[in-house]
């Protein structure tokens, strides 16, 4: 009898996971055109000819809004499974979720007071 009787599927899965990217890259190398023309070296920007410089400095406010968005996006990711299983989790999980939301509200108030949410 085979010793790893419960792990054959895992072994096959790992082999397929290792071979699939290798096969995809190999097929790409075989099927890709070998010549590099002038169009290959040109810049592509949404189907239009690029204009202006590529290196421009963004306002730091974009990053602040992005960070606040990511924080509340992660909050949604954490709270959705909690909301789905709310009835089975009980009072302790409800209190933990309230503490989590309170910490995020404190962070939002801090960002608001520091002016991170104002554009001017």
UniProtKB/Swiss-Prot annotation:
The name this protein goes by in its record: NAD(P)H-quinone oxidoreductase subunit 3
Keyword Transmembrane assigned: yes
Main subcellular location of this protein, as a coarse class: membrane
Family affiliation: Belongs to the complex I subunit 3 family.
GO CC aspect terms: NADH dehydrogenase complex; plasma membrane-derived thylakoid membrane
PANTHER family for the chain: NADH-UBIQUINONE OXIDOREDUCTASE CHAIN 3
Family annotation (Gene3D superfamilies): NADH:ubiquinone/plastoquinone oxidoreductase, chain 3 (1.20.58.1610)
Organism of this sequence: Synechococcus sp. (strain JA-3-3Ab) (Cyanobacteria bacterium Yellowstone A-Prime)
First-tier enzyme category under EC: translocase
